[in-house]
Swiss-Prot record:
Taxonomic path: Archaea, Methanobacteriati, Methanobacteriota, Methanomada group, Methanobacteria
Catalytic activity, reaction form: (sulfur carrier)-H + L-cysteine = (sulfur carrier)-SH + L-alanine
SUPFAM superfamilies in UniProt: PLP-dependent transferases
Family designation: Belongs to the class-V pyridoxal-phosphate-dependent aminotransferase family. Csd subfamily.
Name of the molecule in the record: Probable cysteine desulfurase
InterPro entries: Aminotrans_V_dom, Cys_dSase_SufS, Cysteine_dSase, PyrdxlP-dep_Trfase, PyrdxlP-dep_Trfase_major, PyrdxlP-dep_Trfase_small
Gene3D superfamilies according to UniProt: Aspartate Aminotransferase, domain 1, Type I PLP-dependent aspartate aminotransferase-like (Major domain)
Record has DNA repair as a keyword: no
Enzyme Commission code(s) on record: 2.8.1.7
C-alpha cells in the first residue's frame, strides 16, 4: 500500500493554498475526497435512512452503516458500540444525563478539562452527586496518584481528557482507567484531541465510554461526532431523547425501545456528514495513523523549540509531555491581538482566548489576562510553516 505524503494531503485541501492553518484543535479543513463523498450522497441517493424500502433509502442506509463500521474499526470497537452524535459535547452529555446517578454517588474529574467534559458533571451536584475535582500539576499533567486519592467505593464514574485542548498535555489514560475500575467505577475518556492524531484503542485503554469529534483529527465534516459505549455497560445508559427510529413498538400504554445504538439516535441523522466521516476514516487509513503520529511528534517538537526560543514569549504545558498543541503568550499582549496580527500579516490561523477551558486558565492564573494564543498542528503542516510562525512572532514580540 502506498501511503499519502504531507504534500499529497495538502493538494487535497484547497484552503491551505492561502492560509497557514494552525488551528486543528478547533476544527480541520476538509479534504476533497471527503467533500466528494458528501456531494455524491446529495447528487445520487439523497434519501432518509431506515425509513422506506426503495432503492435510494437502501443505498443511503447501507452507506451509513458502512460509515459506522469504519469508525468502529478505527478505534478497535464493534459497530453496535457506536452512537452517532453531532459532536463530542453531545456524546459526553448522553453519558452524564443517561447514567442512573444516585444521591451520594461521586464523580472524579480533573480541573483542566474542556467545558464539555466539566459542566455536565458539575450539574450533577444538583442531584446530590459528589463531584470531586482533581488538580493537575503546573504543567497540566494529571497525576494518576491524585486520581487514586480521590476515588473510593462511592465513585460511579471517573473521566479525563486524553490530550488537553488548552495545553496539549497527554494524560496516562490507561493507568487512570485501571484506577477507576479497581474501585468499580465506570470510565469515560474525552478523546477529542487524540483521535486522528494518534492510535486510540478503546479496549487497550479500558474505556467504558469514549467521546469523539468527527471534524478535528479525523479531517471529517463539522456536525459529526460519536460516542463509544462498551457492550458491557450499555445496560447502564438511558437515552436522553426519544422519537423516530428509537422504538420497536408504541401503544397508548407505553413503548419498547430499539436495541443499541438505534435507541440513542432519535430523528433524522446528519446522513451526509456521517458518510463524509466514513470517507475521512478511509482517508486517515490511506495516510496511516502511525505516520500521522510520527509527523505530529516532529512538528510538535519543532513548534515548541521555535516558539519557546523567542524572547518575550512564555509557553505553557509540560514540554516533555505535549502533543500537537502549544499555548503561549507574548509579553503582556492580549492573545486576541496576537492572533489578529498573525492572520493579517502572514495568513496564519491560530486560536486565542480561554479555549472553552476557563478552569484550566484559572489554574495557570491566565483567566484575567485573556487566556493564551494556541497553535495546533496536523499532518498537513510543514516545517516551513512553523518557521514562518516563528519569524512572525519574533516581529510581534519586537513591538512590545
Amino acid at each position: 500500500m502506498i501511503f499519502m505524503r504531507t504534500e499529497d494531503v495538502r493538494r487535497d485541501i484547497p484552503l491551505l493554498r492561502d492560509h497557514v492553518y494552525l488551528d486543528a484543535a478547533s476544527t480541520t479543513p476538509t479534504p476533497l475526497p471527503v467533500v466528494r463523498a458528501m456531494t455524491e450522497y446529495f447528487k445520487e441517493y439523497n434519501a432518509n435512512t431506515g425509513r422506506g424500502a426503495y432503492s435510494l433509502v437502501l443505498r443511503a442506509t447501507r452507506k451509513l452503516q458502512e460509515a459506522r463500521e469504519k469508525v468502529a474499526g478505527f478505534i478497535n470497537a464493534s459497530s453496535d458500540e457506536i452512537v452517532f452524535t453531532k459532536n463530542t459535547s453531545e456524546a459526553i452529555n448522553i453519558v452524564a444525563g443517561g447514567l442512573r446517578f444516585r444521591k451520594g454517588d461521586s464523580v472524579v474529574v480533573p480541573n483542566i478539562e474542556h467545558h464539555s467534559n466539566f459542566l455536565p458533571w458539575l450539574r450533577l451536584r444538583e442531584r446530590g452527586v459528589d463531584v470531586r475535582v482533581v488538580k493537575a500539576d503546573e504543567g497540566g499533567v494529571v497525576d494518576p496518584g491524585r486520581i487514586e486519592d480521590a476515588v473510593d467505593e462511592t465513585t460511579r464514574l471517573v473521566t479525563v481528557t486524553h490530550i488537553s485542548n488548552a495545553l496539549g498535555t497527554v494524560q496516562d489514560v490507561k493507568e487512570i482507567g485501571r484506577i477507576a475500575h479497581d474501585v468499580g467505577a465506570l470510565y469515560l475518556v474525552d478523546a477529542a484531541q487524540s483521535i486522528g492524531h494518534m492510535e486510540v484503542d478503546v479496549r487497550a485503554i479500558g474505556a467504558d465510554f469514549a467521546a469523539f469529534p468527527g471534524h478535528k483529527g479525523t479531517l471529517g465534516p463539522v456536525g459529526t461526532g460519536f460516542l463509544y459505549c462498551s457492550t458491557d455497560v450499555q445496560g447502564e445508559l438511558e437515552p436522553l431523547m426519544l422519537g423516530g427510529g428509537t422504538v420497536l413498538d408504541v401503544s397508548e400504554d407505553g413503548y419498547v425501545l430499539e436495541d443499541f445504538p438505534a435507541k440513542f439516535e432519535a430523528g433524522t441523522l446528519n446522513i451526509a456528514g456521517f458518510i463524509g466521516l466514513g470517507a475521512s476514516i478511509d482517508y486517515m487509513n490511506r495516510i496511516g495513523i502511525r505516520r500521522i503520529q510520527k509527523h505530529g511528534m516532529k512538528m510538535t517538537e519543532e513548534l515548541h523549540a521555535t516558539v519557546s526560543s523567542i524572547d518575550g514569549i512564555e509557553c505553557y504545558g509540560d514540554p516533555q509531555n505535549i502533543y500537537g498543541i502549544l499555548s503561549f503568550n507574548i509579553n503582556n499582549m492580549d492573545p486576541h491581538d496576537v492572533a489578529k496580527i498573525l492572520d493579517e500579516t502572514a495568513g496564519i490561523c491560530v486560536r486565542s482566548g480561554h479555549h472553552c477551558a476557563i478552569p484550566a486558565m484559572k489554574h495557570l492564573a491566565l483567566h484575567e489576562t485573556g487566556g493564551t494564543v494556541r497553535a495546533s498542528i496536523h499532518y498537513y503542516n510543514t516545517s516551513e510553516e512553523i518557521q514562518l510562525l516563528g519569524e512572525t512572532l519574533e516581529e510581534i514580540a519586537g513591538m512590545g
